[in-house]
């Protein structure tokens, strides 16, 4: 069997046998809102107890409470869920959409292309089985979360998000876990706690978006904005030369397991329409696309043959399938294209290069720019958010922050205000390849010219010397720009610039970017961010190895690394690791120092009482003989302590009476 067939067969087997999967020592829990159908899924990590006193025969333990953390996996982490990818996930938002009374269910698809695909019997074997008629806004209505927010309406989606973003912080009372630095937010103002009204205000202001198409009721509400947790997007999608529907569905599920807040389907090969349907129906997270990719497929890959009619039909096709946000390269203007001629790497954005070629071949203005108001009308009818693409982003650090990049950014700033006229939720895409010293300029300029609309960046990549490790080179920039105010980070995998990522690449990219996002949250002072850090640090100091693994982003890898050098089960309770060993473990020594210091403090208090009594008996007169007497007493005391030290073996540290005995490792 060829590698391609084997990979596809493995993906098919994954789908056929798909069951909910939980991380170690975790369970799915639900926090209830103000109505019975509003239940917010979280992952609850259980911890072991801490030994605080007693001896081996009578130990005294202190409980460590379970910790609730953000969970992107939806039903895929709920053991009670009935998973069937051929039927899709539960449409739990359907009732919320229907009860608003501002949408209508269509009798058939509006897109001509969709109608052609449905009429093609040759596609039956690829088609998703449980198709439902699409919805759109009633005539004269706008059904976007931005529209509701501006009307002062708090939707169930907004309440859901408020509960989710707080991560049950109110349940954490241990000051060891709640301690945090105030952070440096660079102007961001984060609610504490985050309320549904705060969510509504941020949406109404345009500083945040809730990307939820009315035709994607399976998606769990989430928010993208600088005053909330930094989010991470994962890219998947087939190409003309590799991957399949089965593999992309597998990557979707895999992405949500490892923390993808949104997923972009960047498919460019055959069966784009069918692949997307399978992905959306099985996705608990918002799905984004770049519609120009499919429009190009419809004109046989000839950029010059693109036209507004084909693109418009593609927007409607995807909106009625349930795509939650579109990347639109409407800022690539004809006059900006010559600015890229002196660049080292030219135009590296696929969508940007397509539109640049169209503009030059016709010597006309970008038709996406010319028809932008019509694009907004379509989005307002389905609540599709816009992600204004950075077609002029730099593809090397040599091209960073140049005239072409910032000219486009200023155009995007104007377009976001047009989108807001139509109550269309909008974010701005950013670079790219930017050295560390130029990253903050990008963030500051975006906030200024785009009126604080959420920023969504690819990295940025801080150096160009490490193909195969660009999840590192870009993770550095991602952490920095997340701190400065970026709302969502698009992950980069080890395969960036080299090939299409597989499952493991997706995981590696996501872990790198979840680290970057979390580091940004901690640095800007998000109220709930540092609790998990503190819990893991406490577990580490107390040698609770299993808790260290389970509180981390990737428990399996942490456990595997530990077991490489200390595979014995007894090592899971040992008070050292293989890095320093039992004699030089800094945390073990620190614990002994604390115990020794506490014992000395108790002894000192007792001696102070004795000295005070003696002094009162033999009152101080200030004479030279008394001074000499006190000096002699001090010397005698020091000599006594020296003798005691030697008598106890001349060891620097001694075992504390309540310390758990060392465990002898098996050979």
Swiss-Prot record:
Q: Where does Zn(2+) bind?
A: 433, 497
Annotated signal sequence range: none
Cystine residue pairs: none
Its recorded reaction(s) are: 5-amino-1-(5-phospho-beta-D-ribosyl)imidazole + S-adenosyl-L-methionine = 4-amino-2-methyl-5-(phosphooxymethyl)pyrimidine + CO + 5'-deoxyadenosine + formate + L-methionine + 3 H(+)
Which intervals of the chain are annotated as region Disordered? Answer: 618-642
Q: In which pathway does it act?
A: Cofactor biosynthesis; thiamine diphosphate biosynthesis
Per its UniProt record, what Gene3D superfamilies does this chain match? Answer: 6.10.250.620, Radical SAM ThiC family, central domain
- List, in alphabetical order, the Gene Ontology terms for molecular function in this entry: 4 iron, 4 sulfur cluster binding; carbon-carbon lyase activity; zinc ion binding
Q: Which residues bind [4Fe-4S] cluster?
A: 577, 580, 585
Please list the cofactors this protein needs. Answer: [4Fe-4S] cluster
Pfam families xref list: ThiC-associated (PF13667), ThiC_Rad_SAM (PF01964)
Swiss-Prot/TrEMBL keywords? 4Fe-4S, Iron, Iron-sulfur, Lyase, Metal-binding, S-adenosyl-L-methionine, Thiamine biosynthesis, Zinc
Coiled coil regions, renumbered to chain: none
Q: Which domain of life is it from?
A: Bacteria
Q: Which family does it belong to?
A: Belongs to the ThiC family.
UniProt protein name: Phosphomethylpyrimidine synthase
Give the species this sequence originates from. Shewanella pealeana (strain ATCC 700345 / ANG-SQ1)
């Amino acid at each position: 069997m060829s590698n391609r067939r084997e990979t596809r067969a493995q993906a098919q087997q994954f789908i056929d046998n798909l069951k909910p999967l939980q991380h170690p020592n975790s369970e799915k829990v639900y926090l209830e809102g103000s109505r019975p159908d509003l239940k917010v899924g979280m992952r609850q990590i259980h911890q072991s107890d801490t030994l605080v006193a007693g001896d081996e025969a009578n130990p005294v333990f202190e409980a460590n409470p379970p910790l609730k953390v953000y969970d992107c996996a939806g039903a895929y982490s709920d053991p009670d869920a009935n998973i069937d990818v051929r039927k899709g996930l539960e449409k739990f938002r359907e009732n919320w959409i229907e009860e608003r009374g501002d949408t209508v269910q269509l009798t058939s698809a509006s897109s001509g292309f969709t109608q052609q695909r449905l009429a093609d019997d040759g596609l039956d074997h690829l088609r998703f089985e449980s198709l439902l008629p699409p919805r759109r806004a009633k005539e004269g209505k706008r059904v976007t979360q931005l529209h509701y927010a501006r009307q002062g309406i708090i939707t169930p989606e907004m309440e859901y998000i408020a509960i989710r973003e707080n991560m049950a912080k109110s349940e954490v009372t241990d000051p060891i876990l709640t301690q945090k630095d105030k952070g440096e937010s660079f102007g961001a103002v984060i609610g504490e706690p985050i309320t549904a009204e705060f969510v509504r205000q941020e949406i109404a202001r345009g500083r945040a978006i809730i990307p939820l198409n009315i035709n994607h009721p399976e998606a769990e509400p989430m928010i993208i904005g600088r005053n909330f947790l930094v989010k991470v997007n994962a890219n998947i999608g087939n190409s003309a030369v590799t991957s399949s529907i089965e593999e992309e569905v597998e990557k979707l599920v895999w992405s949500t397991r490892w923390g993808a807040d949104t997923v972009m389907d960047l498919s460019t090969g055959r069966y784009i329409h069918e692949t997307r349907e399978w992905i959306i129906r099985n996705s608990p997270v918002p799905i984004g696309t770049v519609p120009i990719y499919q429009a190009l497929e419809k004109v046989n890959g000839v950029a010059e043959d693109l036209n507004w009619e084909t693109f418009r039909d593609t927007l409607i096709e995807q909106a009625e399938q349930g795509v939650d946000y579109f990347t639109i390269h409407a800022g690539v203007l004809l006059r900006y294209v010559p600015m890229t001629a002196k660049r080292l790497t030219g135009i590296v954005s696929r969508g940007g290069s397509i539109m640049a070629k169209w503009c030059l071949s016709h010597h006309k203005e970008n038709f996406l720019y010319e028809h932008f108001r019509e694009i907004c009308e379509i989005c307002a009818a389905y609540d599709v958010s816009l992600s204004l693409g950075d077609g002029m982003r730099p593809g090397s650090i040599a091209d960073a922050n140049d005239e072409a990049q910032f000219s486009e950014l200023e155009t995007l700033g104007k377009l976001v205000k047009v989108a807001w006229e139509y109550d269309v939720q909008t974010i701005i895409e950013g670079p790219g390849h930017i050295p560390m010293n130029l990253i903050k300029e990008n963030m500051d300029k975006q906030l200024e010219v785009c009126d604080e609309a959420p920023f969504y960046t690819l990295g940025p990549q801080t150096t160009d010397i490490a193909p195969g490790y660009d999840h590192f080179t870009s993770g550095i920039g991602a952490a920095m720009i997340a701190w400065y105010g970026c709302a969502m980070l698009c992950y980069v995998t080890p395969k960036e610039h080299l090939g299409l990522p597989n499952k493991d690449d997706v995981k590696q990219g996501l872990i790198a970017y979840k680290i970057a996002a979390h580091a940004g949250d901690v640095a800007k002072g998000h109220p709930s961010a540092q609790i998990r850090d503190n819990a893991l640090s406490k577990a580490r100091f107390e040698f609770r190895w299993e808790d260290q693994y389970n509180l981390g982003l990737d428990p399996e890898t942490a456990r595997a690394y530990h077991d490489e050098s200390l595979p014995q089960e007894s090592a899971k309770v040992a008070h050292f690791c293989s890095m320093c060993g039992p004699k030089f473990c800094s945390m073990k020594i620190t614990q002994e120092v604390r115990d020794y210091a506490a014992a000395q403090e108790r002894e000192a208090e007792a001696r102070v009482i004795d000295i005070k009594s003696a002094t009162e008996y033999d009152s101080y007169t200030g004479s030279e003989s008394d001074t000499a007497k006190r000096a002699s007493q001090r010397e005698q005391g020091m000599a006594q302590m020296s003798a005691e030290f030697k008598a106890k073996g001349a060891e620097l540290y001694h075992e504390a009476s309540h310390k758990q005995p060392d465990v002898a490792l098996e050979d």
